[in-house]
Each structure stands twice: as structure tokens, then as C-alpha cells.
A protein has these predicted regions:
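A beta-strand edge to alpha-helix "cap/lid" segment located at domain peripheries
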Residues: 1-40, 45-135
Length: 135
């Protein structure tokens, strides 16, 4: 399978649980606008591809939340599926999300999310995130 080796099952299970918990914590920090903790969970080179295809850096994204331009009202994930390759992991899940962006209210609706995490200094951080709206 190329240069990627799967992590042993026991370790993978523990890491998968830690990744799920980290992603749920990340969502809570974004909804509550806890930017101190959010910065710790987002890598310096983080990028978000939003449902409209826009690309935001970590500072643009978290700065938008800090300024009130992005206001998550509700964000509840369903089952989070994890695929791990050493110190890199991909998470995929559906969620229900309600948000206000630049004053425009987007009512609660379903989205698919794909997130790429890397382990930095013993801590998992999200590096890439993409959200796709569904109906």
C-alpha cells in the first residue's frame, strides 16, 4: 500500500477515539468562539474549503469568528469515521449545522465534512477541512 503503513489495531483504536474527541472539541470551540483553544487545535497552515468553494487560512477563519463575521449557532456531528496512517488521519462525517455568515443566516441543514489531521508535538491538529452542503 505504498509508503503508508496502517497503525496496529489497538493503537489505532485509541488514536481514533482521541481523534473523534478532538474533532468534537474543535466543533465546540468554534460554536462557543473559544479562540484560544481553537488556535491550539488548528495547525498554523490550516486551510478550510467552505461549502461555497472559498478557501480560508487559519487566521482568516478564526479571525472571522473573532470578528463575528462567522457565527456558528449549532454544529452537531453524527458518527465520525477515522482512517489513520501513522501520524496522519482523515476524518469524515455528516453533521447538522446552523450558521450566520456576514449577517446572512443559513438555517440548520446537513453537511458532509472531511478533515485531515496531523500529529504535531504529540497533539492532533486539523490541517485541512472541507465542508459540502447536502439536501
Amino acid at each position: 500500500m505504498g509508503s503508508y503503513d496502517h497503525v496496529p489495531a489497538v493503537e489505532a483504536h485509541a488514536d481514533a477515539d482521541a481523534l473523534r474527541a478532538t474533532e468534537r472539541e474543535r466543533l465546540r470551540t468554534l460554536v462557543s468562539a473559544d479562540l484560544t483553544r481553537a488556535r491550539q487545535l488548528h495547525a498554523d497552515d490550516f486551510q478550510l474549503i467552505n461549502p461555497l468553494g472559498g478557501v480560508l487560512s487559519r487566521e482568516e477563519y478564526l479571525g472571522g469568528i473573532d470578528a463575528g463575521h462567522i457565527n456558528y449557532r449549532f454544529w452537531e456531528p453524527e458518527e465520525i469515521v477515522v482512517r489513520q496512517y501513522g501520524e496522519v488521519a482523515v476524518l469524515r462525517y455528516r453533521s447538522s449545522l446552523e450558521i450566520v455568515v456576514q449577517g446572512r443566516h443559513v438555517p440548520r441543514q446537513p453537511y458532509w465534512h472531511t478533515d485531515l489531521y496531523e500529529k504535531h508535538g504529540g497533539q492532533w491538529q486539523v490541517v485541512w477541512s472541507q465542508a459540502t452542503g447536502t439536501e
